[in-house]
Amino acid sequence: MTRLALVAALATVLLLAGCTGTPVSSPEPSPSVPASSSSSPSPEAAPSTPAVVPAAPKRAACYRLSTPQLTKPTNASTPVSCGSRHTAQTIYVGTLDTVVDGHAVAVDSATVQRQLSTTCPSRLAAYVGGSTTARDLSRFNVVWYSPSLAQSDAGADWFRCDLIAFAGEDQLAPLPSTRKLRGALGRSGALADYGLCGTAAPGAQGFERVICSRGHSWRAIDTIGLAGGKRYPGTSQVRKAGDGDCRDLAQSRAGNTLKFRYGWEWPTRAQWGRGQRFGYCWIPG
């Protein structure tokens, strides 16, 4: 998931069968503050202080990150003991590739950002294990941090991938020990603790996405893939595309009775644009 996708995920508007959502506008950026100037020129320019090159982060370090920190490109938080409460753990530390065709590129260039947005999700998959579907149904996610431009200019070339889990829509869950976290989704019943659940029927009043270890009344039981290219097929098309499969799946989970409930959550246009080609099938429970 790209950092832009993560920002959007923190403000997702659900559009489910029989339900409509209200768009949430993004906050306007704060205006920049102009630097103060002096009418009298300085006789001598003060020597610039070179940026201190920080040591590379340590793999398996733990942090108490907050939600606003997740969308920042850099992070200078002090590690905490992994035996204490923490909301992030570094699962990989790598080296930035800042040379393209013999030319140096900036740490915030598209080339470097592509490296981070492909490397860290693959490292997350390897770390937590499980199938692609299990990971899509889980509340686990990954964020990445790199040096600041000044630190990069001074020689810092590392990046780190941090594993996180969402407890609610915009609240991080405390993470378990490293022993329990590594390979977590490869264990039986993992989604009962780390899966995607809801506090009400999806799209209904009072609905909030929560981690399944919290109180809930609905849960996502599967993802349903959708065919299509780059262009969004349209709401009516994606609504119909997975509804039948979700209905059949929910009925089978209900013992093939004629009376059952389900919710088909199809991807929005924005989610489709970010590469999501599946929706969620929900049932009470």
Feature names for model-found ranges:
Residues 10, 20-45:
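Short, low-complexity, disordered segments immediately C-terminal to signal peptides
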